[in-house]
From Swiss-Prot:
Pfam families per the UniProt record, alphabetical: Histone
A GO MF term: structural constituent of chromatin
Protein name, per record: Histone H2B.3
InterPro entries: Histone-fold, Histone_H2A/H2B/H3, Histone_H2B, HISTONE_H2B_site
Family, similarity comment: Belongs to the histone H2B family.
Positions of the UniProt region annotated as Disordered: 1-46
């Protein structure tokens, strides 16, 4: 009879371990009736801003007969984001060095000269100056 007495605690121990090893689904409380009805509600998409339409407009101005693949468009978008981050970072450094709280067109112009090489910087500065004068006159 002694062996039977020893088996009972083992059986109780097995029940405890199975209760402790419940799956995540079993541990979760049942879903409420209010939260379960999601058919009527649509999930709003997070808007992602890209330069794709502007890249396409410039492409059509320069080469109206040429298209661009989605992968090339994605690469161009990444390129513009990268250049923007570099220019913004350099402009912020310049403003900090000069102890100015704002980034002006002067900081942007200087950062363009520092970030972009040679002839490309000259063209970018002239186009930027032209855009700023057009903006202020309008």
């Amino acid at each position: 009879m002694a062996p039977k007495a020893e088996k009972k605690p083992v059986a109780e121990k097995a029940e405890k371990t199975t209760a402790a090893k419940k799956t995540k689904a079993e541990k979760r409380p049942p879903a409420s009736k209010e939260g379960g009805d999601k058919k009527g509600k649509k999930k709003s998409k997070k808007s992602v801003e890209t330069y794709k339409i502007y890249i396409f407009k410039v492409l059509k101005q320069v080469h109206p007969d040429i298209g661009i693949s989605s992968k090339a468009m994605s690469i161009m978008n990444s390129f513009i984001n990268d250049i923007f981050e570099k220019l913004a970072g350099e402009s912020a450094k310049l403003a900090r060095y000069n102890k100015k709280p704002t980034i002006t067109s002067r900081e942007i112009q200087t950062s363009v000269r520092l970030v972009l090489p040679g002839e490309l910087a000259k063209h970018a500065v002239s186009e930027g100056t032209k855009a700023v004068t057009k903006f202020t006159s309008a």
